[in-house]
Amino acid sequence: MSAFGLLILGLLTAVPPASCRQGLGNLQPWMQGLIAVAVFLVLVAIAFAVNHFWCQEEPEPAHMILTIGNKADGVLVGTDGRYSSVAASFRSSEHENAYENVPEEEGKVRSTPM
């Protein structure tokens, strides 16, 4: 591999240096702006793609079943592994799949005008 490196180094030293002052000409201002916008959009697209693939999170399940004894209750999202007494207070004593409408006191209900 060192012989290949020496060959490349010899070729680079044999080639005359390029001058930056010799060019094909300046671009028009509108062309420079167009190129700048295109480069910016490509960089933004790359940033979005990296963010999309790098920062993926597992979706939270919408509904889970927790079995206690022989009775299955729905578990609220975010209360995984913890007992939620909020859902238990809505259960009806007449039917296992029915819920009670518990009247709320007027002071405890928060509402905003639309």
Swiss-Prot record:
It is found in: Apical cell membrane. Residues 52-114 are cytoplasmic. The keyword Transmembrane helix applies. Pfam families: MAP17. Residues 105-114 have a biased composition (Basic and acidic residues). Residues 1-28 are extracellular. The keyword Membrane applies. The chain crosses the membrane at residues 29-51. It is a single-pass membrane protein. InterPro entries: PDZK1IP1/SMIM24. Keywords: Cell membrane, Membrane, Phosphoprotein, Transmembrane, Transmembrane helix. Residues 95-114 are annotated as: Disordered. It comes from the Eukaryota. Signal peptide: none annotated. Disulfide bonds: none annotated. The modification Phosphoserine is found at residue 85. One of its GO terms (cellular component) is apical plasma membrane. Belongs to the PDZK1-interacting protein 1/SMIM24 family. Forms a heterodimer (via N-terminal transmembrane helix) with SLC5A2/SGLT2 (via TM13); this interaction enhances SLC5A2 transporter activity. Interacts with PDZK1. Auxiliary protein of electrogenic Na(+)-coupled sugar symporter SLC5A2/SGLT2 and SLC5A1/SGLT1. Essential for the transporter activity of SLC5A2/SGLT2 but not SLC5A1/SGLT1. This is PDZK1-interacting protein 1.
